[in-house]
């Protein structure tokens, strides 16, 4: 439609979803709907006066969705469900590669691989982290683990979960 208020209506629709986003521990349905609505606005009206705000908010919703995946992945990691955790962290890297969650996702992937005894995979993830995020706190933490002689197991990352449970 050529009505000048149409793009504003698309923007308001996206804002309605966006304003209902709570936190990463809750259902991400509104976050997904907000992202789709902002992307729809940007696709239909790329030079709209709302485009800049829509772009910013779509980046924030992507970061929020990545945070949700990270929260679920951390939960699986704490439960020692390493394969499920790896799936979540890989989704962050694959689907939300421009978010600030990626360095931690790489760290947690290495953590999961080391917990499974898959040191070659952990080494590859560490190399990716060092190449792409050399100044990240998460890469520094990962490098500290690699300096630890006991790096074959989960100690040094989450620590020994069994020892924690007993204390």
Where are these regions (language model features)?
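Acidic, polar-rich low-complexity tracts and alpha-helical solenoid repeat scaffolds
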Residues: 1-167
């Amino acid at each position: 439609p050529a009505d000048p208020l149409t793009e504003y209506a698309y923007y308001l629709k996206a804002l309605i979803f966006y304003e209902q986003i709570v936190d990463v521990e809750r259902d991400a349905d509104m976050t997904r709907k907000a992202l789709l609505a902002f992307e729809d606005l940007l696709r239909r009206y790329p030079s709209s006066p709302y485009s800049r705000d829509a772009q910013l908010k779509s980046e924030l919703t992507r970061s929020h969705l990545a945070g949700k995946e990270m929260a679920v992945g951390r939960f699986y990691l704490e439960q020692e469900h390493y394969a499920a955790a790896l799936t979540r962290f890989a989704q962050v890297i694959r689907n939300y590669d421009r978010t600030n969650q990626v360095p931690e996702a790489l760290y947690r992937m290495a953590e999961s691989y080391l917990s499974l005894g898959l040191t070659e995979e952990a080494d590859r993830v560490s190399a990716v982290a060092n190449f792409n995020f050399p100044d990240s706190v998460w890469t520094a933490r990962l490098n500290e683990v690699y300096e630890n002689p006991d790096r074959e197991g989960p100690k040094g990352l989450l620590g020994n979960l069994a020892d924690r449970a007993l204390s």
